[in-house]
Swiss-Prot record:
Active site per the UniProt annotation: 265 (proton donor)
Protein name: UDP-3-O-acyl-N-acetylglucosamine deacetylase
Biological source species: Laribacter hongkongensis (strain HLHK9)
One Gene Ontology term, aspect cellular component: membrane
Gene Ontology MF terms in the entry: metal ion binding; UDP-3-O-acyl-N-acetylglucosamine deacetylase activity
Pathway, per record: Glycolipid biosynthesis; lipid IV(A) biosynthesis; lipid IV(A) from (3R)-3-hydroxytetradecanoyl-[acyl-carrier-protein] and UDP-N-acetyl-alpha-D-glucosamine: step 2/6
Reactions performed catalytically: a UDP-3-O-[(3R)-3-hydroxyacyl]-N-acetyl-alpha-D-glucosamine + H2O = a UDP-3-O-[(3R)-3-hydroxyacyl]-alpha-D-glucosamine + acetate
One Pfam family cited in the UniProt record for this chain: LpxC
Length: 304
C-alpha cells in the first residue's frame, strides 16, 4: 500500500521571522500516523497543539496564518507546508518559539534540506489523498482560482505586474508534476517584494525581518539582489510554491488540477473552504498498490 510518512528523527534550525523580525527556533519532530501537521508555540506558558486546517487560516495579509479561537497565532507557514507537500510528509509536530516560522532564504529549499537531513520514514498506515470530483472555483474581480478533476497534480498559474522587471520574464507557468520535479523546479523560488511596499508593510507591523538575504527586492525598474534571479520566471514559480503550501493546509495531497490568475493566500484558502463545503465535489482515496497512484506522485523523492 501507499504509506503515510513522517521524519526519522527531530531536526532544529534557527532563523528570522519575515514579518516580526524575531529570532526563531524551529524544531520538526516525528508524529504518529494520522496526526497530520500540528504546530506548537513553545514560547507560550501552555503550548497547545494547533492542527493545520483551512478553517483556522484567519489572517492572509502577505502570508497564511493560523489563528485559534483563543487568539494563538502561527504565521508564514506556506513555505514549510509547500516543502512538506513536495516530500510527501503527512505527520509532523512543528515547534516554534515565536508566532511565525523563520523565513530562511525566502524559498522552500532550506526546509527541504532540513527534512531530508532528518530522514523520512514510512508509517504503517495508508496515505489518504483528496480526489477532486467536480470543478470548484472562487473569483473576485479579474482574479480567480479553480480546482478541477484531474488524474494527477497539475498547476497552471499566471501573475500580472506592469513593471519592467516582470516584463522581462514569463508571467505564466504550467506544470504537471508527472513530468516535473518540485525540488528542482519550484522549491528554490524565493518570495519577492517592492521597495515602495516597505513603508506600507511597516505601518501594518509586517516585513520587519525582510532583507536581500531572504527575498527578491525590486525597485522602480530592477531586481536589487546582486545575484539576480534563480529562474527567469522565479516570480511566478514562487507563487506556485506558495499555492502548493496553501493547498496542503487541507492536510492531504490533492488529486486535481489547480489554476489561477492573480491569486494569493486569501483566495487559495477560500478555494479550500469552498471545496470542503461541497461533499459531492471531493472524496478521500487510498491506494493499495503503487502502480495505481497517479504518476504525478511517483516523483515524490524516495525515503531519506
Amino acid at each position: 500500500m501507499i504509506h503515510q510518512r513522517t521524519l526519522k528523527a527531530p531536526v532544529t534550525a534557527s532563523g528570522v521571522g519575515l514579518h516580526s523580525g524575531d529570532r526563531i527556533r524551529l524544531t520538526l519532530r516525528p508524529a504518529p500516523p494520522d496526526t497530520g501537521i500540528v504546530f506548537r508555540r513553545t514560547d507560550l506558558p501552555e503550548a497547545a497543539d494547533i492542527l493545520c486546517s483551512p478553517e483556522l487560516v484567519n489572517d492572509t495579509r502577505l502570508s497564511s496564518t493560523l489563528v485559534t479561537p483563543d487568539g494563538v497565532r502561527v504565521g508564514t507557514i506556506e513555505h514549510l507546508m509547500s516543502a512538506l507537500a513536495g516530500l510527501g510528509i503527512d505527520n509532523l509536530y512543528v515547534e516554534m518559539t515565536a508566532q511565525e516560522t523563520p523565513i530562511m532564504d525566502g524559498s522552500a529549499a532550506p526546509f527541504i534540506y532540513l527534512l531530508q537531513t532528518a530522514g523520512i520514514v514510512e508509517q504503517p498506515a495508508k496515505k489518504r489523498f483528496i480526489r477532486v470530483l467536480e470543478p470548484v472555483g472562487v473569483a473576485e474581480g479579474d482574479k480567480w482560482v479553480r480546482l478541477e478533476p484531474y488524474d494527477g497534480f497539475q498547476v497552471s498559474l499566471e501573475i500580472s505586474f506592469d513593471h519592467p522587471a516582470f516584463r522581462l520574464a514569463p508571467q505564466k507557468v504550467d506544470i504537471d508534476f508527472a513530468r516535473t520535479s518540485y525540488i528542482d523546479e519550484i522549491a528554490r523560488a524565493r518570495t519577492f517584494g517592492f521597495m515602495y511596499e516597505v513603508e506600507t508593510m511597516a505601518r501594518m507591523g509586517l516585513g520587519r525581518g525582510g532583507s536581500l538575504d531572504n527575498a527578491i527586492v525590486i525597485d522602480d525598474e530592477f531586481v536589487l539582489n546582486r545575484d539576480g534571479l534563480r529562474f527567469p520566471d522565479e516570480f511566478v514559480r514562487h507563487k506556485i510554491l506558495d499555492a502548493i503550501g496553501d493547498l496542503y493546509i487541507i492536510g492531504h495531497p490533492l488529486i486535481a488540477a489547480f489554476s489561477g490568475y492573480k491569486s494569493g493566500h486569501a483566495m487559495n484558502n477560500q478555494l479550500l473552504r469552498q471545496l470542503l463545503a461541497r461533499p459531492s465535489a471531493w472524496e478521500y482515496v487510498t491506494f493499495s498498490h503503487s502502480e495505481d497512484v497517479p504518476s504525478s506522485f511517483h516523483r515524490i523523492p524516495h525515503l531519506a
